[in-house]
Regions:
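N-terminal pre-domains immediately preceding structured catalytic cores
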Residues: 1-149, 155, 162-174, 178-199
């Protein structure tokens, strides 16, 4: 996830290719970061963990986020779960920023630029749970492979491996780079939470 994080500033997810950037969700942080973040991760003080509000009203604590120093582009992703303990996995999808973030135990372990539904076939927003997993799914409706599919709705909306190119869209699904889809599939389980924020 590309995070604009300054001392006392809000967490803001930003797709740096797009301008002007508009944060779909901002959280005020009262924690003070004594030095500029370095390394692969930005850690927050246990006394001042930021919280993300989800569409269903639930709040999730954020203990650390990936420190992504370079701009992310269509097709790019970051994954780093080194030294992150096992824990509950949940996924945050920000359609406005075209970013998907994976959290485990409150720590962001992955972030990817996504493609999503077009105006004629929009991606639904709200809070969902993973209903089904299929590493080698093939859609009969669209006559297309959907590798590492994580189904979110009964009518077929899912997160799956896809080419992620600027200007591309899906029929409502969330497309992520294939290697990222494989890693997400390896940690996500049936019943895990997925929050989709509107564009």
């Amino acid at each position: 996830m590309t995070v604009g994080c300054l001392v006392g500033a809000p967490i803001v997810w930003i797709l740096r290719e797009r301008a002007p950037s508009v944060a779909a969700s901002q959280i005020t942080i009262s924690a003070v970061i004594p030095t500029p973040p370095s390394g692969v991760r930005i850690w927050y003080s246990a006394r001042h963990y930021p919280r993300l509000s989800l569409p269903n009203g639930r709040q999730e604590v954020v203990r650390s986020v990936l420190n992504i120093a370079k701009p992310m582009h269509f097709g790019s992703f970051v994954w780093d779960e080194k030294h992150i303990p096992r824990g509950q996995v949940w996924v945050r999808i920000d359609l406005a920023q075209q970013l998907l973030s994976v959290f485990r135990g409150g720590h962001e372990i992955g972030s990817a630029v996504i493609v999503y539904g077009s105006d004629g076939k929009p991606t639904p927003t709200g809070t969902f749970t993973i209903l089904e997993r299929d590493s080698d799914h093939y859609s009969r409706s669209y006559d297309a492979p959907m590798p590492y599919m994580l189904r979110l709705t009964k009518d077929g909306v899912a997160i799956h491996g896809s080419k992620v190119l600027q200007g591309w869209a899906t029929h409502g699904c969330i497309g992520v780079p294939l290697d990222f889809a494989r890693m997400l599939f390896s940690v996500a389980k049936k019943g895990d939470l997925v929050a989709i924020l509107p564009a």
